[in-house]
Amino acid sequence: MQGPNVAAMGATGGTQLSFADLAHAQGAAWTPADEMSLRETTFVVVDLETTGGRTTGNDATPPDAITEIGAVKVCGGAVLGEFATLVNPQHSIPPQIVRLTGITTAMVGNAPTIDAVLPMFFEFAGDSVLVAHNAGFDIGFLRAAARRCDITWPQPQVLCTMRLARRVLSRDEAPSVRLAALARLFAVASNPTHRALDDARATVDVLHALIERVGNQGVHTYAELRSYLPNVTQAQRCKRVLAETLPHRPGVYLFRGPSGEVLYVGTAADLRRRVSQYFNGTDRRKRMTEMVMLASSIDHVECAHPLEAGVRELRMLSTHAPPYNRRSKFPYRWWWVALTDEAFPRLSVIRAPRHDRVVGPFRSRSKAAETAALLARCTGLRTCTTRLTRSARHGPACPELEVSACPAARDVTAAQYAEAVLRAAALIGGLDNAALAAAVQQVTELAERRRYESAARLRDHLATAIEALWHGQRLRALAALPELIAAKPDGPREGGYQLAVIRHGQLAAAGRAPRGVPPMPVVDAIRRGAQAILPTPAPLGGALVEEIALIARWLAEPGVRIVGVSNDAAGLASPVRSAGPWAAWAATARSAQLAGEQLSRGWQSDLPTEPHPSREQLFGRTGVDCRTGPPQPLLPGRQPFSTAG
């Protein structure tokens, strides 16, 4: 079922069931429905609207909740009944969800809560086959709600129309299998509207159209339909034996080709279970099917915990660059903004700096160039590229003001220009963030002067710069520590602790203290066997960007505690005047930018004349969203503080 589009915005904390986890969807035990023809099978097509895409939360963020349930019971093409109700999520609905679904917090204020609605829905569904479009989303939310309400999950049969569509339709016929796209393809009578009952009705029509297609291929019972879904070739089934020797442990797996070459590298919390999915049709990616056909063996490395598995995967991807992996194969393809080594330094965008006075990393060169131009304006560094000797003076060779103003002072010596260099170095190193405060103030002033377009562009550039500065400062603080030992509880089921020895931002050793075993002797043992790490002059001491970022995220997870640091270190700390105080401002600015982009992609015609409530807080005041008056002139791309804005 089509879930709210916020799942694409986010949230790395989002969780939904894989198709292998759906209750009895594939490979389930025999039920009476298996022997029934599809015409005799009763389906309950369900759709949910929610406050977001996460079924689980943490100490800081609660899980998202269901706001509406809509369902249609059908059999033999006839509608037997419908179920529809709003659900009180017991917290406010985010503005982007309100804009998407039209369901407001006020609308659900008097609605029943999920603990009252769920038993009624299960009674309505009975022992029918549950159908959903993107079933992992909808069934995942229903199961999570049942668990939180202490309601027994009825273990229904589950059918996903999105997966069925991808199995039945070619990509030429259906490039997208989103519900709206399939509704257009089949010209269904009920159009999806991001309201639960409307979407459920549309899914009923899509289901019937897909069943018509499979009927021509000899699929007439629900059991035959389940067997039809996996789309597994006999050659794939024959290779299941490759996974039989793998342990049920976390680790890294490597698919190898006929000549021993590494085809693909991946990680798993359970090696045997994850690798088996490549042979039962759970993984639907075309390139994975091709890779499995080429594979002749599978190697694996057991790991103490998921952090070690993630780090080992990144290192193996860097070493082998497997052809069937798409990410992390080229760990040095990052862009950095660095101070040049010359008499009149400037900010330059380069791939491989030889020192650590850098801003970044950036995936995009254009973002790095925008940040370099903005920081030059903030600190008074020059943007002209003329090579100046120590005895020269800056200014005569700069372009005229009307063309492209150089932010550095004119007619100054190298000694006088050094003040700007010190300001830039202090900003990069986290010793002085006054320039960021001034830039934020300029955004406010532009908004107060009703120059909203200029303010929005400056806001977006500044948000990118703050995020890059703060990200780099945190990673450099971790890379500067000679040694840090951290522990994370292994969860209530396993017990014990996951242990990591981190040296200069790199994982030097990993281990686990099982439940009932004193952890400190284990810490001492893995510390003695830890790898020696020698930092280099490169950014982050030579650590892989993705590795140190992965470790930093792990350290920030709930429950992680620092066991100890090296004797000569004060601990893991950010610079006193880092970009951190402005990180929340940058996050708000980024949300405003995303909201503006969504509006520009088709919501302008629906805008009310007054400011939209979801955009009133762009700059902390109502009315800043005013769209009256002549358009503002565009800011030059490399001069965010120029006379245009």
From Swiss-Prot:
Q: Which InterPro entries match?
A: DnaQ, Exonuclease_RNaseT/DNA_pol3, GIY-YIG_endonuc, GIY-YIG_endonuc_sf, GIY-YIG_UvrC_Cho, RNaseH-like_sf, RNaseH_sf, UvrABC_protein_C
Region called Disordered, residue ranges: 603-645
Query: What's the domain of life for this entry?
Result: Bacteria
> For bias kind Low complexity, which ranges apply?
635-645
Q: Which GO terms describe its biological process?
A: DNA damage response; DNA replication; nucleotide-excision repair
For this record, an example GO cellular component is:
peptidoglycan-based cell wall
One matching Pfam family: RNase_T
Domain named GIY-YIG is located at: 248-326
Query: What's in the domain note?
Result: Seems to contain an N-terminal exonuclease domain and a C-terminal UvrC-like endonuclease domain.
Q: What protein name is recorded for this chain?
A: Putative bifunctional exonuclease/endonuclease protein Rv2191
Source organism per entry reads Mycobacterium tuberculosis (strain ATCC 25618 / H37Rv)
Lineage of the source organism? Bacteria, Bacillati, Actinomycetota, Actinomycetes, Mycobacteriales
